[in-house]
Amino acid sequence: MNDKCVVLNAKKMNFDGKLDFSVLSSDVTVYDDTTEQQLSERIQGADIIVTKEMPVSAEMIQKFPESVKLICEAGTGYNNIDLEAARKKGITVCNIPSYSTERVAHTAIMMILNLSSAMQVQMKMLACGNHDNFTRNLQVPHVEVNGKTLGVIGAGHIGRKVIQIAQALDMNILVYTRTPKEDEKGICYVSLEELLKNSDYVSMHCPLTESTKHMINKETLSLMKPSAFIINTSRGALIDEAALIEALENGMIAGAGLDVQETEPPEETNPLYTMDQVLLTPHMGWKGLETRQRLVSILADNIKQFMEGNPINVVSGLSYLAK
């Protein structure tokens, strides 16, 4: 079967030019970027469309040719695609739920360890020529993580990997999730309010939906300990950024580790850039070459299984049997 596959914005995942997309289909066309004006011409006759965090609106989907059977989001999050519009047009949408599990979990743990030692502050001090910490007591917070409580919001693949590593660090675990499991050793399932009140570190690992947008806001931030840190390696809009900045400025919480932001990249004037208690990274959790190669491999399997009538990783649409 010679199925036409179009990759609309490959540069988003292939920024170093090292990925091979030929495994997706014997007939694959790859574009670095695609504007909405270019879309119609580029997807004519396409069976499969691949995107990476590119907005795919209802208006765009309505204009898709009838040949389109599958939209593949080349990542875990799929809030960029109008799922209802795809469903109405009979188009299946799939994602890649676990390609970056290890790497993103490592990023979250790295942030916890970094913030516990104010590593970014100490590096800045040395870079500015302040060598006092070599000869006298530390002038920044420096705490152990063992025995501290980690609150994990969302217990999917990444959340559970974070829990596994945190348990190896002898951290206590609180979890808030829609799907708790019974009798899990060392894990205590609690309400969001209880988690925020009792955690020394809070790590976000849930998808961005209408119900989770700004779930961390002025009200929920006020529940946290003044000594607590919040970590977000999931989606920026889970946290009301303005409320977070206010909480940090007023000392309501101790700090934040953010690999994702509401607007990426943040505006140049965003206070998060210059806050000593913030560890800000450029959505790097998924960007390692090994991780991206795994992404393409799973993406190819998604397409293969779908076209053989056994769709996997479906987030919306019909259990479409390819003809």
Per-region residue spans from a language model:
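Phosphate-binding beta-alpha-beta segment of Rossmann-like dinucleotide-binding domains, i.e.
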Residues: P97-T149, V315
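Rossmann-fold NAD(P) dinucleotide-binding segment
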Residues: P55-V68, S211-F229
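Short glycine-/small-residue-rich Rossmann-like dinucleotide-binding loops
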Residues: M54, T76, D200, C206-L208, ...
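Rossmann-like dinucleotide-binding domain for NAD(H)/NADP(H)
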Residues: K89, V93-C94, K218, S227-K323
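N-terminal glycine-/charge-rich "phosphate-binding" loop or analogous flexible N-terminal tail
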Residues: M1-I48, L174, M307, A322-K323
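Short beta->alpha connector loops at strand-helix junctions that form conserved
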Residues: D32, A74-G75, I91-E102, T177, ...
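Rossmann-like dinucleotide/phosphate-binding beta-alpha-beta segment
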Residues: V23-L24, L138-P226
